[in-house]
Amino acid sequence: MRWLTVTLVTVILALQWPLWFGKGSWLRVWQLDKQLQEQRATTQKLVARNAALDAEVRDLKQGSDAIEERARNELGMIRNGEVFFQLLDPSKNPSRASHR
């Protein structure tokens, strides 16, 4: 009887081993599922980024307002006859504010 029990336990363990630790085991499935979720999150971020870039490209191709806005904000350009005023916040530049 003892021999039969040992044999059955051994057979059960031999059958369960690939299920838990083999190539297609539950652990591997769990790892792949986690990796898939991370990939989906990354893909979602990239899709949102691509949509924003696509909208910006379409805006630059179709309208001059976007080009003018970028020229003003990024390059500091102004139109003829305009005067540019730059107001500095004294609380953000303590070294200049302390000299007054």
From Swiss-Prot:
Using the record for this protein, list the coiled-coil segments as residue ranges, or answer none.
49-73
Please give the family membership noted in the entry: Belongs to the FtsB family.
- Species whose genome carries this gene: Chromobacterium violaceum (strain ATCC 12472 / DSM 30191 / JCM 1249 / CCUG 213 / NBRC 12614 / NCIMB 9131 / NCTC 9757 / MK)
User: Where mainly located?
Assistant: membrane
Q: In what way does this protein cross or attach to the membrane?
A: Single-pass type II membrane protein
Summarizing the function annotation, the protein's role is:
Essential cell division protein. May link together the upstream cell division proteins, which are predominantly cytoplasmic, with the downstream cell division proteins, which are predominantly periplasmic.
- Top-down, what is the taxonomic lineage of the species of origin? Bacteria, Pseudomonadati, Pseudomonadota, Betaproteobacteria, Neisseriales
* All ranges on the Periplasmic side of the membrane: 22-100
Which residue intervals are topologically Cytoplasmic? 1-3
Full protein name: Cell division protein FtsB
Q: Where in the cell is it found?
A: Cell inner membrane
The family database entries (HAMAP family) matched by this protein are listed as:
FtsB
* TM region positions: 4-21
In terms of superkingdom, the source organism counts as: Bacteria
